[in-house]
């Protein structure tokens, strides 16, 4: 599936038209928000309608309303899916969410080209996702530095130990995401965070991604060394996403005593 998505993305890049930039782009520090979380673990809450493996996750999809609910519940950042064909996202969702909330916004897509980096800036993203399994390490490094030169931060995602090692042989990203889901098989296990987190330098922000749906999961990935987590599907499947965030942290509604 990953290879198919990347082939589609290469086709899309060939015809990419850059949008007009936002009149005033106010950068919101992404890594800093995760280093100073509002709770025991930083939360990047994801706005996500569908996925290739699960189909439609949230039929009543209002990205702005969802993002505002996440912000009210104390999310440290918002992730917005912008891939259209496989995740039923849209780049206009990113711009709309950025204009509606006051926390940093991450663009979640399969970014493989410098034009997509420029596009992300124009859409108002504060950070972008770069997927280690989707890019040669030298290309990832080039896109990473291009992004930072334009004022974008990067969440560099890995799943396999070999991918992590290839990236760290070239440079040290500030934010490293450990995807608990194998993008080739879609098998998910929190053991990925347990395995990879000890290999990452303490200077990096470690984000555990995928497979987190309960307070026990939150405590587990924290014990493995994660400082933040990216959660989408388990929140999006619940009717009230604001209450879902509270429950994820083992709280009564609005009670952050934990």
UniProtKB/Swiss-Prot annotation:
An example Gene Ontology biological process: L-tryptophan biosynthetic process
Catalysed conversion reaction: 1-(2-carboxyphenylamino)-1-deoxy-D-ribulose 5-phosphate + H(+) = (1S,2R)-1-C-(indol-3-yl)glycerol 3-phosphate + CO2 + H2O
EC assignment: 4.1.1.48
UniProt keywords, alphabetically: Amino-acid biosynthesis, Aromatic amino acid biosynthesis, Decarboxylase, Lyase, Tryptophan biosynthesis
InterPro entries: Aldolase_TIM (IPR013785), Indole-3-glycerol_P_synth (IPR045186), Indole-3-glycerol_P_synth_dom (IPR013798), Indole-3-GlycerolPSynthase_CS (IPR001468), RibuloseP-bd_barrel (IPR011060)
Transmembrane region(s): none
A GO molecular function held by the record: phosphoribosylanthranilate isomerase activity
Name of protein: Indole-3-glycerol phosphate synthase
Gene name of the record: trpC
């Amino acid at each position: 599936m990953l290879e198919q998505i990347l082939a589609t993305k290469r086709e899309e890049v060939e015809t990419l038209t850059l949008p007009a930039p936002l009149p005033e782009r106010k950068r919101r520090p992404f890594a800093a928000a995760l280093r100073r979380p509002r709770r025991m673990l930083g939360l990047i809450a994801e706005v996500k309608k569908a996925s290739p493996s699960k189909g439609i996750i949230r039929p009543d999809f209002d990205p702005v309303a969802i993002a505002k609910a996440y912000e009210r519940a104390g999310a440290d950042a918002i992730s917005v899916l912008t891939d259209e064909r496989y995740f039923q996202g849209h780049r206009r969702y990113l711009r709309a969410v950025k204009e509606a909330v006051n926390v940093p916004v991450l663009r979640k897509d399969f970014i493989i080209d410098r034009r997509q980096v420029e596009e992300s800036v124009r859409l108002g993203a504060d950070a972008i996702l770069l997927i280690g399994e989707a890019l040669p390490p030298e290309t990832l490094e080039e896109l990473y530095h291009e992004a930072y030169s334009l004022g974008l931060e990067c969440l560099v995602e890995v799943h396999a130990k070999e991918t992590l090692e290839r990236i760290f042989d070239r440079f040290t990203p500030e934010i490293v995401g450990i995807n608990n889901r194998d993008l080739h098989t879609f098998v998910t296990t929190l053991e990925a965070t347990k395995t990879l987190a000890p290999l990452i330098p303490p200077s990096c922000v470690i984000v555990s991604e995928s497979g987190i749906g309960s307070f026990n999961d939150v405590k587990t990935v924290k014990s493995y060394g994660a400082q933040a987590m990216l959660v989408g599907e388990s929140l999006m499947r619940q009717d009230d996403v604001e209450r879902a965030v509270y429950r994820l942290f083992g709280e009564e509604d609005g009670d952050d005593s934990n």
